[in-house]
């Protein structure tokens, strides 16, 4: 289950997107997305440049939502979501390469301004996967 061990949280956890987390998202090729389903974690992914083309700000990340039916069902039951991204192009604390987990609350929006923005950039999208960032944990 997501966040089932809060005592294990990284001491370097920060609120919203700090400069390192933002740089990581700006350079990540692929982002893994985890939601909690009734039978355990559900893992999907998206291309990092898709979020960059729609929108990343200090509090929110937006991906185009194609299918994501199970992701949407999971988020309706439990809005917690985690993103994992990594890039060797970002300097880590111990050498080349940085990775991190972004924790937040998510929803799939099929209507509204954010869905329209996603559909304008990606005509195949049925809406937007919107992540409200709560905190980031850098790894590596």
Where are these regions (language model features)?
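Binding-site signature for planar aromatic cofactors or substrates
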Residues: 1-140
